[in-house]
Amino acid sequence: QVIKILVVGCGNMGASHAQAYHELPDFEIVGLVSRGDSKRELNVRLNASYPLYEDYAEALADSKPDAVCIATYPDTHETYAVMAFDSGAHVFIEKPLADTVTGAERVIAAAERSGKKLVVGYILRHHPSWIKFIETGRQMGYPLVMRMNLNQQSQGYMWDVHRNLMKSLSPIVDCGVHYIDVMCQFTDARPVQVSAIGARLTNDIPEDNYNYGQLQIRFDDGSVGWYEAGWGPMMSETAFFVKDVIGPLGCVSIVANEASASGHSD
């Protein structure tokens, strides 16, 4: 059965998903939704003529999708996901599920109420390098020390993207959901303590947000981990890409020889 899918958000991730749906025979794109010109540019890139929508509610009602791919800014995730479930569609949504814990709980409740699938884009769970990294790290004994970061010296277009993201959330929330999920896969123990620090290094973001942060997490088997993320042209490129796990029996790391602090190296 071909799945009719509505793609909401036509930026980096939305365009990537649309490219896949365009090429996979099991999917039929029934619409592209965005607030700007990105949907038209995506149609050109795909050499397609998919229906284009400015308004998400109109797109849902008109296209009647089997599933919705939500790749918009995080402050819309909760509302868009609940609307999709209320329309009877399955949902694939980019991380984070919502920009608050209570928002995420409301999305989950809507999924359960509708009986439809809710899938969050935890890409690292399917990445061969990360699968091997976790498999090897679990052989290092316990407790583990898990050190991870991704600092991005973003400029120009990417700094615009990051500033827009920081209107609703911080770097450690946007990216950290990946790495806390990874830490939970390294150890089957229960997280028991979380703390964090942060700093606002620019006036270009809301006063109540920060563009540099580090969180620390402790598990009940004695394992500990930290994750650090910073965005902006002021960020240092020294030790900006750390993916490292240490246990009683040794250590394992991901070394990105060609990673760029201003690129997309998750």
PLM region descriptions:
Residues 1-47:
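N-terminal Rossmann-like dinucleotide-binding module
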Residues 17, 38, 50-110:
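Beta-loop-alpha module in the N-terminal Rossmann-like domain of NAD(P)-dependent dehydrogenases
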Residues 31, 67, 145:
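Short, Asp-centered acidic motifs that coordinate Mg2+ and/or phosphate
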Residues 54, 93, 118-120, 227, ...:
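Hydrophobic residues in well-ordered beta-strands that form the structural core
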Residues 106-123, 141-148:
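Rossmann-fold dehydrogenase core element
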Residues 124-206:
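Predominantly a Rossmann-like dinucleotide-binding segment in NAD(P)-dependent oxidoreductases
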Residues 180-259:
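Contiguous beta-strand/loop segments that form the cofactor/metal-binding neighborhood of enzyme cores
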